[in-house]
Amino acid sequence: MNSHQNQTGVQKKGITEKIMEKLPGHHGPTNTGVVHHEKKGMTEKVMEQLPGHHGATGTGGVHHEKKGMTEKVMEQLPGHHGSHQTGTNTTYGTTNTGGVHHEKKSVTEKVMEKLPGHHGSHQTGTNTAYGTNTNVVHHEKKGIAEKIKEQLPGHHGTHKTGTTTSYGNTGVVHHENKSTMDKIKEKLPGGHH
C-alpha cells in the first residue's frame, strides 16, 4: 500500500492506510508475537464501537491498551459490557404473563393530553420483541388538572372503560377516560368505532 520508511528504517503508514483502517468492516493489520503498546485517539475509539470493525489482531503477543475517556464513559453506559462484547441483546419469543404496567407520564405527555383533539397514548404491550403479552393491566396516574376538573360543576365524573384489545396480545386491559369529543362522536350516526 502506501507504506513509507523513515530514516531509521521503521515503516510508517501512509494516509490511505490510516483512513482505510478507520472505515467500518476493515480488519486492520495482523501482528504475530509482538508486544504492542497503543494509545488511541478519539477517532479510533469511536470506530472500535462501530459494528464490523475489528482493529488489530495480535496472536501470541501481549497487547496493552491505555483506555481513553470515551471508552471509560462507554463502559459505564447501561447495556455496554466492555470493549469485547459479543452477541446481541435481542430477545425473541418472550412471554410476559400477569404483569402490571404503571405509567408515569412526562410533562410533554400531560400537556399534549390537555390539548383539544388529543386522546392520550394507546400503547399496550410494549418492551417485548416478537413475543406475547398476556393479562397486562395499564394504569394511568391522574394529574392535578384532571382532579380539579372532576370537582367542577357540570363534570359528570370519569367514565372508565375496560376494553380488551387484541392487537397480537391477549387479555390486555387499557383503562382510559373518554374525552368530550369521544362522547360526541359516539352520539353521531356512524360514529361507533
UniProtKB/Swiss-Prot annotation:
Comp. bias (Basic and acidic residues): 173-193
Tissue: Expressed in desiccated pollen grains or seeds, roots, stems, trichomes and the vascular tissues of leaves, and in all tissues of young seedlings.
Any Pfam family hit: Dehydrin
GO MF, any single term: cobalt ion binding
GO CC terms in record: cytosol; membrane
Signal peptide (from-to): none
Biased composition, class Low complexity, residue ranges: 86-99, 160-171
GO biological process terms, semicolon-separated: cold acclimation; defense response to fungus; response to abscisic acid; response to cold; response to water deprivation
Induction context: By low temperature and also less strongly, by water stress or abscisic acid (ABA).
InterPro entries for this protein: Dehydrin (IPR000167), Dehydrin_CS (IPR030513)
Region (Disordered): 78-100, 153-193
Similarity comment: Belongs to the plant dehydrin family.
Protein's recorded name: Dehydrin Xero 2
Organism, as annotated: Arabidopsis thaliana (Mouse-ear cress)
